[in-house]
A protein has these predicted regions:
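An N-terminal, well-structured beta->alpha segment
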Residues: 1-58, 62-64, 127, 137
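Residue-level signal for pocket-adjacent positions within structured domains
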Residues: 5, 9, 99-102, 109, ...
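Generic alpha-helical secondary structure signal
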Residues: 21, 76, 116-120
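Ferredoxin-reductase
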Residues: 31-109
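Gly/Ser/Thr-enriched, mixed-charge loops and adjacent short helices
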Residues: 104-137
Length: 137
């Protein structure tokens, strides 16, 4: 089982490993883990960030999360919003990595990245594929 998370989120080459499907499944995992809570989501200006952003939002909504969309924003702004609004966070950014890379930084309600224990729990859900989808009945 490959470790997904690094120091702060995941970073991968877009459309090699970090595909819309990968982002969707990772968002299912995070959405399942936080049990339908609210998530504030933002992205950076990379061309492919919008694709990953849309996949993450879709995955969170499928698991019953409420989503606040910030769109194009800076990571510190999203961190502030998480603290201010008491929400979880997801930032689509590769920070300083080369242009072909992108990443997803999940945040706690404090605006800080997930701690190791939370990373491990999200990874377990990701690899087990035991997602909690909301019923639309």
């Amino acid at each position: 089982m490959e470790k997904l998370f690094g120091t702060f989120g995941i970073r991968r080459v877009v459309n090699e490993i970090l595909t819309p499907d990968f982002a969707l499944k990772l968002a299912y995992s995070f959405g399942t883990y936080i049990n339908q809570e609210t998530v504030t989501v933002g992205r950076d200006a990379r061309k492919h960030s919008e694709m990953i952003y849309d996949a993450v939002i879709s995955g969170l909504l499928a698991c019953g999360c409420q989503v606040i969309e910030l769109g194009l924003t800076a990571t510190p702004t999203l961190q502030w919003a998480c603290r201010q609004w008491n929400t979880w966070g997801a930032m689509i950014t590769a920070s300083h990595n080369p242009p072909q890379w992108n990443g997803i930084k999940f945040m706690e309600k404090t605006g800080k990245g997930l701690d190791h224990e939370n990373d491990v729990e999200v990874e377990k859900i990701f690899y087990s594929e035991k997602y909690d989808f909301v019923s639309w009945k």
